[in-house]
Amino acid sequence: MSALQASLLLRPLPSPLPPRRRLPLPSSSASFPRAGHHRRLPLPLRALASEGPQPAPSPAPDPPPPELPAAPEAEEVVGTAAAEGGGKVEEEELEDLVEKGRAWVLALAAAVVAAARRFFDWVVSGDWMSWWPFWRPDRRLQRLIDDADANPADPAKQSALLHELNKFSPEDVIKRFEQRSHAVDSRGVAEYLRALILTNGIADYLPDEQSGRSASLPALLQELKQRVSGNEDKPFMNPGISEKQPLHVVMVDPKATGRSTRFAQEIFSTVLFTIAVGLMWVMGAAALQKYIGSLGGIGASGVGSSSSYSPKELNKDIMPEKNVKTFKDVKGCDDAKKELEEVVEYLKNPSKFTRLGGKLPKGILLTGSPGTGKTLLAKAIAGEAGVPFFYRAGSEFEEMFVGVGARRVRSLFQAAKKKAPCIVFIDEIDAVGSTRKQWEGHTKKTLHQLLVEMDGFEQNEGIIVMAATNLPDILDPALTRPGRFDRHIVVPNPDVRGRQEILELYLQDKPVSSDVDVNAIARSTPGFNGADLANLVNIAAIKAAVEGADKLAAAQLEFAKDRIIMGTERKSMFISDESKKACLFKLLYFILRELILTAYHESGHAIVALNTQGAHPIHKATILPRGSALGMVTQLPSQDETSISKKQLLARLDVCMGGRVAEELIFGEDNVTTGARNDLHTATELAQYMVSNCGMSDAIGPVHVKERPSVEMQSRIDAEVVKLLREAYGRVKRLLKKHEKQLHALANALLERETLTADEINKVVHPYQEEPQLSFQEEDFALT
């Protein structure tokens, strides 16, 4: 940018220094175009359009540094500044300032302004700002001006300058063309005509009826033709002279002339929009981060807080004494408690086990129906073990952000590694450990991290992972395999002895009346778990407090039991005494009938297993509901089995038929229930396996039948399966008739105790093993 541009940007002000040489100022018509939509002509072109090419001014030597003038000289400077700068300061005011001795202030200000102007001229004249985008068009135009002035006889460079100049100021194109000091060609003439149209100067050459002016456009075109006739170019047409050469006038939209301007504006607006969107995104991200951080405040467990990723460690020192649980507080699940006591003993005295090569189990999975005491067992381990205890709920791992669950798993095990040996307890692990599904990617990440931490490439020595769940069937097989969860401990519903121990535990800190029979309450609450019994005692205590009693009586406990079993009484509904007695009798009848039927059903299985060669030994018999079964007889093999004989398979068929046959013998053929459907399903599958896969049928022979046999073969297989089942049914009926007294004795023992072990079953049936079969009269007496 030249010094001429600097002289136009700043208004001339007087200076105590000698003024530098400057180019003549352009005229107002060249500085400001007529049309408001045109871009303003760059400053170097204003003098160019009015005076033509000028030789480049030689730079003047920099003046010496200014010295502060004396008062009289300052007065002269002020007067000069007032005259040349067009200031509004009156002479009287200046004289007052001089008299007051403040003229040096004006002189100093003038010197500062002059120095600023010289500095600005120096910056603008250099290439310091040439990298700015808005400076590039001016540089291009300045380059075209220099080329055109250096080659005035080159029409191509003159036309290029006129074409570029037409984008900024068509008036300057007209003035430069009409100076006749440069060579032109047809393209230059076209740019000149375009400038006339843009500035509406073409109207001066058209006829005017009001003034009587004739058209001079043909003369203009003839003149333009003569200007280009001497150049090596295509012959210039003379339009408008005849019909064969008409004059084509194109109306140009003023908006089209600012195409480059609009392009620059679009780029500028795009950049502004991008910057605005970026700022909004940054501000939104900052606000979101601040909001997330606020979720993790004091007492919160938000995603943004560091405490949300740190595991919870049980500190017995700050816990109330009543909240610290031990194995003494766990009743009704002796088998599960015994296995967990071994783990605690291992943690307290590891040398006792390691001397024989024993290793600490990596994982313990507690399963069972709700309310059986799985979490209570974990609390007892936390109270008994002398090692750190970390705990998390399965639902605490996942949140709305992907990756949070895996990070919390890593944080949990990192904290556990620092304090090993320790125990990590995850309650309701099915929330994160369920079978992996394709559409649950975030849950899979959490489960994968848990699998790696439990048994991955890096070994976690000294960390025992405990977990509790009510739904073990939906857990991922990779999680429940040995090496991750080595022990699966089932916490069942308590039996009669367990319920009695639980009731005594909950009643020990309460005043109890002497008429309360804990054993009777335990026998009258079959199917109750620990949570139900705790609720029973609590309801009875509230009832006693409402009635104002000093002690818990049997009436309050009976009321609580009835409320849990039958619900709240509807006292608003009137029922007669006869209806009450009938309903109570029916309820007791159905309950007792169901229990008696279940007891005989399970006793039938047990008696057949005891008296059939090849059957597995009995482990336990119970009439407590287990899953979908009302009762169960479990059998365990005495040793590992690699192959099974036909005798053993037939014994299994007989055991499956024992329950249905017992129901038919005791209650009659018409009173057989659907409780044996699972037994029949198992027996049918076993018989079909013997016939189709093992070749244990004389009618079919030693043949392995494929999955889809022919119709004839399938009918023969079905007939043989039915034959095996009927033969087993007949054998079992004869056996139970022979040992019917054992059946009655075992059923009565189950009704009394609900659960019997193998030794207890043998003690019950042993006195009746050698006695003969009962007569019909004795059978009726036994039933009564």
Swiss-Prot record:
Cofactor dependence is on: Zn(2+)
| Single GO molecular function | ATP hydrolysis activity
As for subcellular location, the record says: Mitochondrion membrane; Plastid, Chloroplast thylakoid membrane
**InterPro entries assigned to the protein according to its UniProt record, in alphabetical order:** AAA+_ATPase, AAA_lid_3, ATPase_AAA_core, ATPase_AAA_CS, FtsH, P-loop_NTPase, Peptidase_M41, Peptidase_M41-like
Instruction: Note how many cofactor molecules are bound and how.
Output: Binds 1 zinc ion per subunit.
Its EC number is 3.4.24.-
Matching Pfam families, A to Z? AAA, AAA_lid_3, Peptidase_M41
Protease as UniProt keyword? yes
A Gene Ontology term for the protein's cellular component? mitochondrial membrane
* Comp. bias (Pro residues): 54-69
Q: Where is this region: Disordered?
A: 1-71
Which PANTHER family does this one have?
A: ATP-DEPENDENT ZINC METALLOPROTEASE YME1L1 (PTHR23076:SF97), METALLOPROTEASE M41 FTSH (PTHR23076)
Q: Which HAMAP family match?
A: FtsH
> Could you identify this protein by its name?
ATP-dependent zinc metalloprotease FTSH 9, chloroplastic/mitochondrial
**Originating species:** Oryza sativa subsp. japonica
Gene name, please? FTSH9
